[in-house]
Amino acid sequence: MNYQLIPVNLKKKVKKEDGKTEYVNYAEEIPQDPEMEKLLKSYQDKGDALLSQKVGKLNGKLEGDRTIIRFEQTNLGHLIAEAQRQKAKADIGIMNSGGIRDSIQEGDVTYKDILKIHPFGNIVSYFELTGKELLDYLNVVALKEVDSGAYAQYSGISMTVNRADKKVKNVKIQGKPLDLNKTYRISLPSYNAAGGDGYPVMTKNPTFVNTGFIDADVLKEFFEKNSPINAEKYIPHNEVIFK
């Protein structure tokens, strides 16, 4: 059996005899059902109340516009990577720019603002790599092209990315030089851990953990715990240099 989705009271544009246009219903108009409207309104009100819930206060702007965050490191990218890093108790936080869909403006921050940033319900995950394995991993992830959702934002790491040589250099974790024999924990959205955006697949790594923590909830909790948040605190200071 075939089904077709037909919008209620769909209109079409028609030209009248005098040359003007107007919109008319394709079929007989279906009147609103007051009882159903009343029933649905109660759920809408509950949803609006939840979305308008204040989760924190922001001084300054956190930049998440796709024309910026997919080209350079931003304070919002840094903050989100840091929030997920802390939640996973990781050494490094990596966040794909494609998972950040909006900016946050100065003032009161609501749950709706959080969901505009993270509308997909991605899960925070983590895995562990030796320093040598991490270097190989970064030689893939850090070289993802700008103007794509794969372009990564970071926390807990500094490095120089040489696009010509296709290698990262001068890697430091938490301010200390990368130890090739040490084991490091990395937080990452589950989407990318599964190979999304062309990232190396980490879900088969024996240390991989899906935390079950939804990205929007992690960001909401970070605001609740750290409010008021000063946007300037998260401005990148050339921790990641591209050449």
Feature-to-residue mapping (PLM):
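Glycine-rich phosphate/diphosphate-binding loops and the adjacent beta-loop-alpha structural elements
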Residues: 53-73
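Hydrophobic alpha-helical scaffolding
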Residues: 26-33, 37, 48, 66-74, ...
